[in-house]
Amino acid sequence: MSATARQTAPMPVDIKSRKGGEPIVSLTAYTTPMAQMMDAHCDIVLVGDSLGMVLHGLPSTLEVTMEMMILHGRAVSRGLSRAMMVIDMPFGSYEQSPEQAFESAARLMRETGAGAVKLEGGQHMAQTIEFLVQRGIPVMAHIGLTPQSINTLGGYKVQGRGPQAEVLMQDAKAVAAAGAFSVVLEKTPQGLSDEITASIDIPTIGIGASAGCDGQILVVDDMLGLFTAFKAKFVKRYAELGDLGAAAIAAYAADVRARRFPAPEHVFADAEPKANTKR
């Protein structure tokens, strides 16, 4: 087992208790094999609505549906035994009212086995977060760049510079006070991210924020080089699996066209092989 491997699955209360301690490791997953690969090394595996873009070729996360989240959530759940699974609430499934949010969150958790839900928004979503937590649904909050709000934010811009910094600080304090067990800070300035981390009593999970956050998360297809439509500044590529995969497919195509594949070791003889009678 790798030196980074863990032994037991954390609960939301365990994640919250990690505030100021060992950094929390998080990645997104959308399939069973990928979940199995990261299970021993991640504290949190997020079934992110980013699946709409990286798996389904959609232009944004806005087109992602509950049915898509449930399908992929079930797949990821089957691949996990150690990491805690958190699932994104898709656009339109929680914004209308706390009651709508509860119905959607309960369905997501019931049908996927997720340990918590993640929703976007700060002060304006605090009432909804509190409503969910009071009814037994753990919530990971998400502030800063919130991809479901790109049409009102004006695109994928850094959030929290200038006067907006105080707004984000108040967002963080509001979701913490409402009962969120952690909060994602996306594409927020380093200094502000550190100030928020020091100002609230729940872990901050950074993505394009600061190494000083209580944990980090990346989209797995970004860090493995599988999603190549664009590369965000905050992404570190730990592998170039897209290039490796393309090269492997090209080699396979060449072998098929040259009749090198299947080779003798890949096919079956007409007669049954003789049993080995040697003792």
UniProtKB/Swiss-Prot annotation:
Q: E.C. number, please?
A: 2.1.2.11
Q: How is the cofactor bound?
A: Binds 1 Mg(2+) ion per subunit.
> Can you name a GO cellular component term?
cytoplasm
Which reaction equation describes what this protein catalyses?
3-methyl-2-oxobutanoate + (6R)-5,10-methylene-5,6,7,8-tetrahydrofolate + H2O = 2-dehydropantoate + (6S)-5,6,7,8-tetrahydrofolate
* Top-level lineage group: Bacteria
Q: Where does Mg(2+) bind?
A: 49, 88, 120
Name a single GO biological process: pantothenate biosynthetic process
Which GO-annotated molecular functions does the record name?
3-methyl-2-oxobutanoate hydroxymethyltransferase activity; magnesium ion binding
Q: What class of enzyme is it?
A: transferase
Q: Which UniProt keywords apply?
A: Cytoplasm, Magnesium, Metal-binding, Pantothenate biosynthesis, Transferase
Do you know which Pfam families this protein is assigned to?
Pantoate_transf
Q: What cofactor does this chain's UniProt record say it requires?
A: Mg(2+)
According to UniProt, this protein's pathway is: Cofactor biosynthesis; (R)-pantothenate biosynthesis; (R)-pantoate from 3-methyl-2-oxobutanoate: step 1/2
Annotated compartments? Cytoplasm
The answer to whether keyword Ubl conjugation applies is: no
Binding positions for 3-methyl-2-oxobutanoate?
A: 49-50, 88, 118
What residue intervals traverse the membrane?
A: none
The reply to whether Nuclease figures as a keyword in the UniProt entry is: no
What protein family is recorded? Belongs to the PanB family.
Protein role:
Catalyzes the reversible reaction in which hydroxymethyl group from 5,10-methylenetetrahydrofolate is transferred onto alpha-ketoisovalerate to form ketopantoate.
Q: Which HAMAP family match?
A: PanB
Outline the subunit composition: Homodecamer; pentamer of dimers.
The protein's name in its UniProt record: 3-methyl-2-oxobutanoate hydroxymethyltransferase
Organism in which the protein naturally occurs = Roseobacter denitrificans (strain ATCC 33942 / OCh 114)
